[in-house]
Amino acid sequence: MAATRYEPVAEIGVGAYGTVYKARDPHSGHFVALKSVRVPNGGAAGGGLPVSTVREVALLRRLEAFEHPNVVRLMDVCATSRTDRDIKVTLVFEHIDQDLRTYLDKAPPPGLPVETIKDLMRQFLSGLDFLHANCIVHRDLKPENILVTSNGTVKLADFGLARIYSYQMALTPVVVTLWYRAPEVLLQSTYATPVDMWSVGCIFAEMFRRKPLFCGNSEADQLGKIFDLIGLPPEDDWPREVSLPRGAFAPRGPRPVQSVVPEMEESGAQLLLEMLTFNPHKRISAFRALQHSYLHKEESDAE
């Protein structure tokens, strides 16, 4: 299906992943989001998409069969213009008007009600558990790629496309935020699905605070801000193969979660700490977080 079938309406934004347009499907009248990214020419006879791109798109199309309510739908993929070096691929997603950043900013003081936060978190974790069960690590969760529909449905976006996006990102001089990155990513250690649960913890705290939890300006500065809250981890938990030694950071103990998220009750603080656990092998999974008592009890002291 050709990308020209869709009529661009407005530019939504420009990011590390390229330019995003809101467009209209004239056949259905529905709005869609168009993301055009460049991928390297596969180099086979006559060119073509790289095998890695074909595999990633095939996996995402398979996920469509499940129609998970908390995952943005990939409706179409079109390879359009090409050169000797690269091919422009247009990804057609369902269009959602706002992201979590906008949703939080629009909430009147003092912010979102606790029960709304719990509902958002249950949906967020449900979508993420679905991705993890299908062996997809998001790797870049942040409020800007968690979308919220007008009726409060959470949908995860920009997942499963890491290899497709990597070429475009190398061409785009956009600073990728470190604020939601797990320690193992900051240390350039090996990583898997637990990296996403660290990001979930940062976003969970931000729903209460209405501002990011850790705002570092370099990998080392980000780690320092993390250790200011959770304490310097023990030597046994420090990954062996990284260039930044544990000794580069001053010893310090943990602080109470309520010192940075005073509105959070004790069981919520306990869940947050299970997400913000330094050792990824000890970090709570999306599946286990969904079972946590905090997300299933009414707020006892709700105002």
From Swiss-Prot:
Could you name the active-site residues?
Answer: D140
PTM Phosphoserine: at which residues? S300
What reaction does this catalyse? Answer: L-seryl-[protein] + ATP = O-phospho-L-seryl-[protein] + ADP + H(+); L-threonyl-[protein] + ATP = O-phospho-L-threonyl-[protein] + ADP + H(+)
InterPro entries of this UniProt entry? CDK, Kinase-like_dom_sf, Prot_kinase_dom, Protein_kinase_ATP_BS, Ser/Thr_kinase_AS
| MF annotations from Gene Ontology | ATP binding; cyclin binding; cyclin-dependent protein serine/threonine kinase activity; kinase activity; protein kinase activity; protein serine kinase activity
Residue span(s) of domain Protein kinase: 6-295
Question: Out of the domains of life, which is the source?
Answer: Eukaryota
Which Pfam families is this protein grouped with? Pkinase
Say where the protein is mainly found. Answer: cytoplasm
Q: Which processes are annotated in GO (biological process)? A: cell division; cellular response to interleukin-4; cellular response to ionomycin; cellular response to lipopolysaccharide; cellular response to phorbol 13-acetate 12-myristate; G1/S transition of mitotic cell cycle; positive regulation of fibroblast proliferation; positive regulation of G2/M transition of mitotic cell cycle
| Region (Required for binding D-type cyclins) location | 50-56
What is the activity regulation entry? Both phosphorylation at Thr-172 and binding of a D-type cyclin are necessary for enzymatic activity. Full activation of the cyclin-D-CDK4 complex appears to require other factors such as recruitment of the substrate via a substrate recruitment motif, and/or formation of the CDKN1B ternary complex. Inhibited by INK4 family members. In resting cells, the non-tyrosine-phosphorylated form of CDKN1B prevents phosphorylation at Thr-172 and inactivation, while, in proliferating cells, tyrosine phosphorylation of CDKN1B allows phosphorylation of Thr-172 of CDK4 and subsequent activation.
Q: Which UniProt keywords apply?
A: Acetylation, ATP-binding, Cell cycle, Cell division, Cytoplasm, Kinase, Membrane, Nucleotide-binding, Nucleus, Phosphoprotein, Proto-oncogene, Serine/threonine-protein kinase, Transferase
* Modification note: Phosphorylation at Thr-172 is required for enzymatic activity. Phosphorylated, in vitro, at this site by CCNH-CDK7, but, in vivo, appears to be phosphorylated by a proline-directed kinase. In the cyclin D-CDK4-CDKN1B complex, this phosphorylation and consequent CDK4 enzyme activity, is dependent on the tyrosine phosphorylation state of CDKN1B. Thus, in proliferating cells, CDK4 within the complex is phosphorylated on Thr-172 in the T-loop. In resting cells, phosphorylation on Thr-172 is prevented by the non-tyrosine-phosphorylated form of CDKN1B.
The positions annotated for binding ATP are: I12, G13, V14, G15, A16, Y17, G18, T19, V20, K35
Q: May I have one GO cellular component term? A: nucleus
In terms of CDD domains, this protein maps to: STKc_CDK4 (cd07863)
Q: What is this protein's function per UniProt? A: Ser/Thr-kinase component of cyclin D-CDK4 (DC) complexes that phosphorylate and inhibit members of the retinoblastoma (RB) protein family including RB1 and regulate the cell-cycle during G(1)/S transition. Phosphorylation of RB1 allows dissociation of the transcription factor E2F from the RB/E2F complexes and the subsequent transcription of E2F target genes which are responsible for the progression through the G(1) phase. Hypophosphorylates RB1 in early G(1) phase. Cyclin D-CDK4 complexes are major integrators of various mitogenenic and antimitogenic signals.
Name the family: Belongs to the protein kinase superfamily. CMGC Ser/Thr protein kinase family. CDC2/CDKX subfamily.
* Subunit structure and binding partners: Component of the D-CDK4 complex, composed of CDK4 and some D-type G1 cyclin (CCND1, CCND2 or CCND3). Interacts directly in the complex with CCND1, CCND2 or CCND3. Interacts with ZNF655. Forms a ternary complex, cyclin D-CDK4-CDKN1B, involved in modulating CDK4 enzymatic activity. Interacts directly with CDKN1B (phosphorylated on 'Tyr-88' and 'Tyr-89'); the interaction allows assembly of the cyclin D-CDK4 complex, Thr-172 phosphorylation, nuclear translocation and enhances the cyclin D-CDK4 complex activity. CDK4 activity is either inhibited or enhanced depending on stoichiometry of complex.
Q: Which PANTHER family match?
A: CELL DIVISION PROTEIN KINASE (PTHR24056), CYCLIN-DEPENDENT KINASE 4 (PTHR24056:SF129)
The protein in question is named: Cyclin-dependent kinase 4
Q: Which organism is it from?
A: Mus musculus (Mouse)
